């Protein structure tokens, strides 16, 4: 299936996929997803933003899986950092479905950060900042955070220690994980974990929410 910039996901495909994740989107949100995918395909020829070449799989794996986490974001206008944002997942889809969020997209790769800035600009996303930095170097620029999230960061001990540190003081972390990572993450100190939630239409993919122990 083509992944050229000319390919546009249909409104029907987006609505059908979102319904399978128990998500309801407005016409405007559907249009934002369509615009986002067009920018993604254009840039993916120059910057490796996703290895997935099937637009429908991108819709399910990146957009719907990201937006599925919105039910675990506790406050409508909370401060949320997406660490290792890459192609903007999960931070930008979360912003699309929860437009009152204050979002920080943290990405150390300059080319990927430039892509993120273009998406933010073209979609007209307010209260959304792209930070070109390693997460370990951030503190007062983002603190205090209500939620730190990540889909593919790894290095869980250092990441969770940073999120719990006084200079960041994140109240919660929201992670998209494979089943083999669950035990490692739940063994980390400073956090109490909810029960993992299976991600629809996936094999051994889970959402895990942790709350910082004061």
Task: Give the role of each language-model region.
Residues 40, 94, 210:
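Residue-level signal for inorganic ion chemistry
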Residues 82-86:
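Conserved S-adenosyl-L-methionine
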């Amino acid at each position: 299936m083509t992944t050229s910039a000319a390919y546009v996901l249909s409104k029907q495909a987006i609505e059908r996929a979102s319904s399978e994740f128990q998500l309801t989107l407005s016409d405007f949100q559907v249009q934002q997803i369509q615009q986002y995918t067009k920018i993604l395909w254009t840039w993916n020829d120059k910057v490796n933003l996703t290895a997935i070449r099937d637009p429908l799989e991108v819709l399910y794996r990146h957009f719907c899986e990201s937006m599925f986490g919105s039910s675990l974001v506790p406050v409508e206008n909370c401060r949320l950092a997406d660490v290792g944002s890459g192609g903007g997942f999960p931070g930008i889809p979360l912003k699309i479905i929860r437009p009152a969020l204050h979002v920080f997209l943290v990405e150390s790769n300059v080319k990927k950060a430039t892509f993120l800035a273009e998406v933010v600009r073209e979609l007209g996303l307010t209260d959304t900042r792209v930070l070109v930095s390693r997460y370990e170097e951030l503190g007062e620029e983002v603190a205090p955070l209500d939620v730190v999230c990540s889909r593919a960061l790894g290095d869980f001990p250092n990441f969770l220690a940073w999120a719990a540190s006084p200079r960041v003081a994140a109240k919660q972390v929201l992670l998209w994980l494979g089943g083999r990572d669950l035990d490692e993450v739940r063994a980390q100190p400073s956090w109490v974990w909810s029960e993992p939630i299976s991600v629809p239409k996936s094999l051994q993919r889970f959402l895990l929410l942790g709350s910082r122990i004061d």
